[in-house]
UniProtKB/Swiss-Prot annotation:
Lineage: Eukaryota, Viridiplantae, Streptophyta, Embryophyta, Tracheophyta
Originating gene: rpl22
CDD domains: Ribosomal_L22 (cd00336)
Presence of keyword Cytoplasm: no
Protein's GO biological process: translation
Similarity remark: Belongs to the universal ribosomal protein uL22 family.
Organism of origin: Lactuca sativa (Garden lettuce)
UniProt name for this protein: Large ribosomal subunit protein uL22c
Subunit structure, as described in the record: Part of the 50S ribosomal subunit.
Record keywords: Chloroplast, Plastid, Ribonucleoprotein, Ribosomal protein, RNA-binding, rRNA-binding
Length: 157
């Protein structure tokens, strides 16, 4: 029987204070590239959107090494998307006691990385047969501990 293995990890950045259009301009350059190539591109691009995306790519790679134990050399950005977030509304004071509405856009960025060295499916039949015990004991004795004497802390005065 084949079971599906998780080969993808993601990092999600929410409420990043920049326009989704400006973040998409950077995301389109790194989609489908390897981890090391992505870091080099993001360090050299002169846009303000590069720094939060750099942090998300680095976080997704840390998630992959912690959760799956994968190496950074094998990581590829499989999916990168930018969605519009909430609009933060502020008031700017103007002349003669008036105010002017300022809308500050936010965005949500999702980076999904895939480990290309791992297989997507695992053959569980070969694993379960090798891990089963060869003989079972029919009768097992259970030993109960005396739960009322726990080292004598309550017995002493």
């Amino acid at each position: 029987m084949l079971n599906k293995r998780t080969t993808e990890v993601y990092a999600l950045g929410q409420h990043i204070s920049m326009s989704a259009h400006k973040a998409r301009r950077v995301i389109d350059q790194i989609r489908g590239r390897s981890y090391e190539e992505t870091l080099m591109i993001l360090e050299l691009m002169p846009y303000r959107a590069c720094y939060p995306i750099f942090k998300l790519v680095y976080s997704a790679a840390a998630n992959a090494s912690f959760n799956m134990g994968s190496n950074e050399v094998n990581l590829v950005i499989s999916k990168a998307e930018v969605n519009e977030g909430t609009i933060v509304k502020r008031l700017k004071p103007r002349a003669r006691g008036r105010s002017f509405a300022i809308q500050k856009p936010t965005c949500h960025i999702t980076i999904v990385m895939k480990d290309i060295s791992l297989d997507e499916y695992i053959d569980t039949d070969s694993i379960t047969w090798s891990q089963k015990p060869k003989s079972k004991k029919k009768h097992t004795t259970m030993s109960y501990y005396d739960m009322y004497s726990n080292g004598g802390t309550w017995d002493k005065k």
